[in-house]
């Protein structure tokens, strides 16, 4: 079921899901892919982005064959939709596939999870070729229309079985993707606060306090290493900074989601992203998840009672070559759809629709 806009309608799983069953992050990790898949089945449906599959340079295919794993390949360049996930699920079932493998960026990671879900919860191995989001790790899929409008999230009651992230591939991606993932990772600390000036153990659940503590640690590492990592990726170098940032963007961001049961680690920043994709679908198309989330987090900082932090945060965004405002991503501030965005944000699950909160927005 797609995620509703009302908190009362969002069905949350009572179980904590702390991460992937197995997580591999190293240079040459594609050579281990076949062995990871063979643990789960002898035939796989591989769903891959065309550019991502090319970026594996034949190593994924060789590893699968060397491990005795047969596979069907679907090169998929489109949005992560319910319709295509159900078609992929039917393909997997009718061809006798026992495991789903996703190779690519966030949309492919989410399509692989949705496919596995509709195929009766087949096992999943994710091969992220981008560190722009934690999609490989998170137990949910962000779903879209074919045109790219957001339909909310499809949530799962289980973790992915394995993640295989080859750092030789990651250090060759455009640094823009790493920067977007950094902003998405930094968002966790900001959005967990959601309307609070600070997070205290006495005021929140131990799960959310744990999520905040981990997110705060990650935030400080981002401040220290983000620029170096992006510089190194631009030069195609695999360094400690790149390894650290990749781990934070994918694994740690995913763990933050898990220890908060998948709700509470995101708020107005991510809701802004969802609403921009919904109301300004065409304008948003050229922009990455973290680029839009970061714009929303400027609002989130003010809503948290820290307007003084907006300027330094925007300065950091500028240093990472991020757009700073909705106008920067081609949205006319005088568009009548802006009122729709505002009202949807005001009536979102992340704030009480009071006069005080309306003034804070």
PLM regions: where:
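C-terminal charged capping/lid subdomain of soluble metabolic enzymes
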Residues: 2-10, 198, 306-361
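ATP/NTP phosphate-donor binding region
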Residues: 2-99, 326
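A glycine/threonine-rich phosphate-anchoring loop and its flanking beta-alpha core
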Residues: 21, 118-212
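Short glycine/serine/threonine-rich phosphate/pyrophosphate-binding segments
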Residues: 30, 53-57, 107-114, 133-137, ...
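Generic secondary-structure signature for well-ordered alpha-helical cores
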Residues: 38, 65, 69, 93, ...
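A short, small-residue-rich loop immediately preceding and capping a beta-strand
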Residues: 92-130
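Active-site segments that bind and position negatively charged phosphate/pyrophosphate groups
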Residues: 203-316
